[in-house]
UniProtKB/Swiss-Prot annotation:
UniProt: ATP binding residues: 29-32, 86-90, 413, 479-481, 495
Catalysed reactions, semicolon-separated: ATP + H2O + a folded polypeptide = ADP + phosphate + an unfolded polypeptide
Keyword Cytoplasm found: yes
Family: Belongs to the chaperonin (HSP60) family.
One Pfam short name: Cpn60_TCP1
Record's subcellular location: Cytoplasm
Subunit structure, as described in the record: Forms a cylinder of 14 subunits composed of two heptameric rings stacked back-to-back. Interacts with the co-chaperonin GroES.
Annotated Gene Ontology cellular component terms: cytoplasm
Enzyme class: isomerase
Name this protein carries in UniProt: Chaperonin GroEL
Organism expressing this protein natively: Thermosipho melanesiensis (strain DSM 12029 / CIP 104789 / BI429)
Highest rank taxon of the organism: Bacteria
Gene (UniProt): groEL
E.C. number(s) listed in UniProt: 5.6.1.7
Protein purpose: Together with its co-chaperonin GroES, plays an essential role in assisting protein folding. The GroEL-GroES system forms a nano-cage that allows encapsulation of the non-native substrate proteins and provides a physical environment optimized to promote and accelerate protein folding.
Length: 539
């Protein structure tokens, strides 16, 4: 396949045009008075959105060189979205501002490598300032504020705050479609896994077809149980206490299952057998989680624990165990809190090390179950288009809220980035030559988001910037919705610090890469055949 090449200034100009195409489409959505963008879909109804990353992902340019620039800006938006769940539009606006100024200076003869070095130094200083300004979230109202701003809805903000309060910092919150038009939170307390009773004869509530035991003993093993003999000693010990027994094993069959069912039906021993969750190594890890949560041990051949030797101390305990046809819930495990915390810390470390998204999700789910539960936000709407848009907003708001809990909050509305110009100004004074130019580019770019917010709301950005900088209070800023100057924290105009930091760092990273690009290589499009009819063969 033949290639096409572009060099130096011509290459950078093509990239800039691609960047502008995406940034101009995205930046009109910034701020409380940002506009919407309607995106045509190849099937189904069009999508109406004001989410930066959704818009950026849809843009594909015809000119292959310009399209490279567009793809780079998409990278800024999606990287910021992956890390912080929000701030994609801010990141795009910052990247465009840095690239515009950078290309101007590089074209005038500045060394792109030194310019990039200056950009990096200035960004490091700005990030420190963002950390200084940030405030930790103190209560549920703060969480609701952050979520409301990101989702542009107080109702959604309250739902997310309620869900986070219930499941805690490490809990899992998922977003699903509701069967009605209402949006609400469903909460599953305790450890829940998708395995139910092996036989319906274990059922204690025939109406609901479920097994409910209070204060049961829990036997946990990774073996397949078919012979009853190894179980008899522990079954006798449990029967003497008068408490029920829950058996979680790889499988229970044959003689073992028959004996357990008969004991249950005669009332000798209330029991239920449940298949262990997961497969392979994941099953072993989940059984260990259940053991730690309930204060028991896993009777495993690998560690040489025989079923005949088990004592009551080796069994787990819980306040309630509820078993349905294909679901088991363990509520109020009696495990040692310190051990549970250690296990959660261990899973957290695994999450940080893994690169697989699927692995990350399963680890987070395990952590949530240990931490105390899973919340599901059920999203309802009148039409499919509204449902898609609402679901997307909730997912975004959820990520932004988690980011706020992690690194705290800063004043929103582009104010924090504007305040971060102060330390950058010092860097500009300290540096010289082309590095100074790089730092100056960042200094100018930091005012781009507030400028755009003001423009979208119909105000003059330069006047607002001047007015805001007259006050030294980092929280003092401009409410573009009401057209008033105010304390941004008091007014509830806040952003997660992680979102602001990620937006700046990702924008600078792409700008630096783009400025140091000297050659573009793309595939040459194949010439189209204007004669679609095949030639007739000659006979």
């Amino acid at each position: 396949m033949a290639k096409m090449l572009r060099f130096s200034e011509e290459a950078r100009r093509a990239l800039e045009r691609g960047v502008d195409a995406v940034a101009d489409a995205v930046k009109i959505t910034l701020g409380p008075k940002g506009r919407n963008v309607v995106i045509e879909k190849s099937w189904g109804s069009p999508t109406i959105t004001n989410d930066g990353v959704s818009i950026a992902k849809e843009i594909e340019l015809e000119d292959k060189f310009e399209n490279l620039g567009a793809q780079l800006v998409k990278e800024v938006a999606s990287k910021t979205n992956d890390v912080a769940g929000d701030g994609t539009t801010t990141a795009t606006v910052l990247a465009q501002a840095m690239i515009k100024e950078g290309i101007k200076n590089v074209t005038a003869g500045a060394n792109p490598i030194l310019v990039k070095r200056g950009i990096d130094k200035a960004v490091a200083a700005a990030v420190e300032k963002i950390k200084d300004i940030s405030k930790k979230l103190s209560n549920s109202d703060d969480i609701a504020h952050v979520a409301s701003i990101s989702a542009n809805s107080e109702e959604i903000g309250k739902l997310i705050a309620e869900a986070m309060e219930k499941v805690g910092e490490d809990g899992v919150i998922t977003v699903e479609d509701s069967k009605s038009i209402d949006t609400f939170v469903e909460f599953t307390e305790g450890m829940q896994f998708d395995r139910g009773y092996i036989s319906p004869y274990f059922v204690t509530d025939p109406e609901k077809m479920e097994v409910v035991y209070n204060e049961p003993f829990i036997l946990i093993t990774d073996r397949k149980l078919s012979n009853i003999k190894p179980l008899i000693p522990i079954l006798e010990k449990v029967a003497q206490t008068g408490k029920p027994l829950v058996i979680i094993a790889e499988d229970v069959e044959g003689e073992a299952l028959t004996t357990l069912v008969l004991n249950k039906l005669k009332g000798t021993l209330n029991t239920v057998a449940v298949k262990a969750p997961g497969f392979g190594d994941r099953r072993k890890a989940m059984l260990q989680d259940i053991a730690i949560l309930t204060g028991g041990i896993v009777a495993s051949e690998e560690v040489g624990i025989n079923l005949e030797d088990l004592t009551l101390n080796d069994l787990g305990r819980a306040d309630v165990v509820r078993v349905k046809k294909d679901e088991t819930i363990i509520v109020g495990g009696h495990g040692d809190q310190e051990e549970i915390k250690k296990r959660i810390a261990q899973i957290k470390a695994q999450i940080e090390q893994t690169t697989s998204e699927y692995e990350k999700e399963t680890l987070q789910e395990r952590m949530a179950k240990l931490a105390g539960g899973v919340a599901v936000i059920k999203v309802g709407a009148a039409t499919e288009t509204e449902l898609k848009e609402k679901k997307h907003r909730i997912e975004d708001a959820l990520s932004a809220t988690r980011a706020a809990v992690e690194e705290g909050i800063v004043p929103g509305g582009g104010i924090t980035l504007l305040r971060a110009r102060k330390p950058v100004e010092k860097i500009v004074e300290e540096l010289d030559g082309d590095e100074k130019i790089g730092a100056k580019i960042v200094y100018e770019a930091l005012s781009a988001p507030i400028n755009q917010i003001a423009k979208n709301a119909g105000y003059d950005g330069a006047i607002i910037i001047h007015k805001v900088l007259e006050q030294d209070d980092p929280a003092y800023g401009f409410d573009a919705l009401k057209g008033e100057y105010c304390d941004m924290f008091e007014r509830g105009i806040i952003d997660p610090a992680k979102v602001t930091r990620s937006a700046l760092q990702n924008a600078a990273s792409i700008a630096g890469m783009l400025l140091t690009t000297e050659v573009l290589v793309v595939e040459k499009p194949e010439p189209k055949n204007n004669n679609p009819m095949p030639e007739m063969p000659e006979y």
